[in-house]
Amino acid sequence: MPRNLRFLSVVNHVTKQVPTTCMRCAVGCGHVHLGSENAYGLETVRGDPSHPVNNGLACGRGIRESADPAGEWLTRPLVREDGELVQTSWSDAMARVGATIRTAVATDPDEVAVLGSGQQTNEAAYALGKLARAGIGTRNYDANTTLCMASAVTAYYRAFGSDAPPPTYDDIPNAETHLVWGANPAVAHPVMFRWIRQSATDGRLVVVDPVETKTAAVADDHVSVAPGGDLALARAILRHLVDTDQIDESFVRSNTEGFDDVVSALPSVTDAAARAGVSLDTVEELAALLDAPTLIYWGMGVNQSVRGTATAGALVNLCLASGNLGPGTGPFSLTGQANSMGTRVCSSKGTWSGHRPFEHPDHRRAVAEAWDVPVSRLPDDSGPGPVGILDSSPSVVWTVATNPLAGFPDATAAREVLRDSFLVVQDAFRSDTVELADVVLPAATWGESEGTAMNMERTVSRIRAATETPPGVRQDLDIIADVAARVAPGLLPRPPVSPSAIFDEFAALTEGTDADCSGISYTRLDGERAVRWPAPEPNSDAGYRYYDPSTSRWTFPTPSGKARFSTLDGEPLPEPVDGDYPLTLTTGREADGYNTGVRSRSDTPEEPVARVNPETVDTYHDAVADTDGELRTTVVSRRASVSVTLDRDDAVPPGLVWLSIHHPMTNQLTSPAVDPQSNEPNFKQCAVRFVHPDAPAKADFLAAEVSD
């Protein structure tokens, strides 16, 4: 019996086949769920042949994690008594949460931090953002989507005036070149990668990544760029296009601005290629790819850097300069979590609902009127991002479907802040963060929930319950509404809340915006399965290419109506290697892992496995213990030390240490430095060294800190 059948029962349950949306990644595949007849949970999961996104295709991991997640379920509210978490009633738990938030708000609304997630439904995300901004009034509101997507979002806004990817899945079959940069869709987006490989059969698939990933292993070519060298490589390619007269001059002059400023700041091809760690021939070959209709995909390898916005902008620059913005072309950011897009559109920390500019007075008034609160109640800036939020040491932290104790960079520092705060954790699974909580609120997961989600190509789909919510567990939306009733009465309906009513409220607030969802309703989604925004009318949706074929004109939602080239030059890497820390640590996904691993691992392994090149092992053999062929060392950064098992792997270049993002200890090592434009952390690069596991690792670490 699947482990997510939480309680055996003989009561009646939903047993019909229920169409819904996969909760694993942002491809947004339609699923069909069948609830169990004799228990709470899902009996079977399969792809939905009627869903327009995937037409029945589904990856094994999405099916497996929907039907049988490996995490430990939360089943009752918990509160901390005498240092221990003990079961309590919902009324007691909610009374504690409400009273504590009210007390903090009376002192300063910014004493309350609210952290949401790309795992929420649109409705829960919208309600949480409304409560945080208009009820609590805090600027310290964000979601874990900023940890992975903020740099791409910021680059899109800077280029197009909107966080709306120009390409859609419809473009994949029409592209002749698929340039995958700092992403691993073979692991992270298997269904989408199947489409990419099918299209590349008659074209080219090229991967830019320091590591030979699963995607790179089946590509036509793999460019092993130096860690942190992505921006330099993109600039080298653009410089080559300029030097060889391969710019689409007509498109650039008519539809863009800022090109001359970019060109004047470009380094020479030779200098940029050297910084990227590639040959001049490689630059020439990559530039030649752009002659054909090209989709440039990128992911966390680009975004999670102090240079993330600059690098994503440089990739957009390549599309603009080469005219790759029509069918079968364009800059395509690959979103990770299932509802990252929805979290941004519904309640983004950087904009109001519907991409309304946060600091624009007209939009602030419109939001205040829609929410029936004074404009003065709304915070006057969008906040410092997740890392900055914890740096401010709020007295109350409320997390919803996220695990900051394992997911934040410099996790030890995050632990100290969370330990000193009144911590409220709302989740379906027992996460690392739960262990520090003062109150734990058990929430329903997707197979038990009603709502909607948005995938990476802006398509809205329904999430439907195929099983009842177990006793002791509540819907995210109802929990948020209960807190609102205690903190800001009247702001949200009292639970139980109608998800469709909340969606209608959200959709109405998007009317006239670039993310117009006002033509989408539950009734429409019940009939069509999925609708792509902008959809301003009940029978409309859009490809959103910023192009009107009836007039042959490009129009972008920028002040000038033109797309903008990025002139950002990027930040220096915060931790270049040196004599004390000669190795570079990077992080990445594994095929069977998900985020911090809460729902994809049943037991925490004793120590993570670090993939390293055999040459690296040989170079630092004095710091490696070999016990009957098992290699172990201690990885030490400027923040922490972690014992690891070494996996000799030729796919990882010499000098690089690769750790999985799914292990809860990984982010003890990573740097809290953030991109100054997006506030996204620099997860993909920090300096480390190896220390023999029998050495006093902690003392070694402290000594290093003193000497720095």
UniProtKB/Swiss-Prot annotation:
This is Assimilatory nitrate reductase. [4Fe-4S] cluster binds at C22, C25, C29, C59. Induction: Repressed by the presence of ammonium as nitrogen source. It catalyses: nitrite + 2 oxidized [2Fe-2S]-[ferredoxin] + H2O = nitrate + 2 reduced [2Fe-2S]-[ferredoxin] + 2 H(+). Its cofactor is [4Fe-4S] cluster; Mo-bis(molybdopterin guanine dinucleotide). Its EC number is 1.7.7.2. It comes from Haloferax mediterranei (strain ATCC 33500 / DSM 1411 / JCM 8866 / NBRC 14739 / NCIMB 2177 / R-4) (Halobacterium mediterranei). It is found in: Cytoplasm. Binds 1 molybdenum-bis(molybdopterin guanine dinucleotide) (Mo-bis-MGD) cofactor per subunit. Belongs to the prokaryotic molybdopterin-containing oxidoreductase family. NasA/NapA/NarB subfamily. Is probably a monomer. Initially characterized as a dimer of proteins with a MW of 105 and 50 kDa. Inhibited by cyanide and azide. InterPro entries: Asp_de-COase-like_dom_sf, MoPterin_dinucl-bd_dom, Mopterin_OxRdtase, Mopterin_OxRdtase_4Fe-4S_dom, Nitr_red_NasA, Prok_molybdopt-oxidoreductase.
